[in-house]
């Protein structure tokens, strides 16, 4: 994957023989590019549902806090940090029921297929973000459901959709 004029070496975990499957998606790329446009310097950044750690690796210079939901996500992110020469000790993470980062400025969320899991993420982010925080969400178009927007509107005043 290329981000901010750098090539990032990413692989799926567990590994797969299917070469058409990548460790990142167009949603990751769109979320990252949009976030870059907001300015990331001196911002507290949270990452949610970063399945293989693509966003964690891409934003490693900004010390993002990853919210991890399962062991394979944890292993994949550690693997990809190591594959890119990044120290795993500097990487902070917690689970969505006990987010260890507060006053988040920008949250990047790849929306899961489950509306219930999305609602948990949004609910927890709402509790840890500031009133002026920005939450950028991305998803695979084929998985879209209007329910996601309805859920976001339960917690936030300004909910908009693009692309």
Specify the residue positions occupied by each region the protein language model found.
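S-adenosyl-L-methionine
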Residues: 1-43, 54-55
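Non-catalytic substrate-recognition/targeting regions of SAM-dependent transferases
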Residues: 1-16, 139-163
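Conserved SAM-binding loop of SAM-dependent methyltransferases across substrates and taxa
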Residues: 51-63
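Conserved SAM-binding motif I beta-strand of class I
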Residues: 63-70, 137
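Conserved SAM-binding loop
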Residues: 77-80
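A short acidic, Gly/Pro-enriched loop at the edge of an enzyme's catalytic core
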Residues: 93-106
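A short SAM/SAH-binding and catalytic strip from SAM-dependent methyltransferases
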Residues: 105-119
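A short glycine-rich, Lys/Arg-flanked "PGG" loop and its adjoining helix->strand segment in the class I
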Residues: 118-134
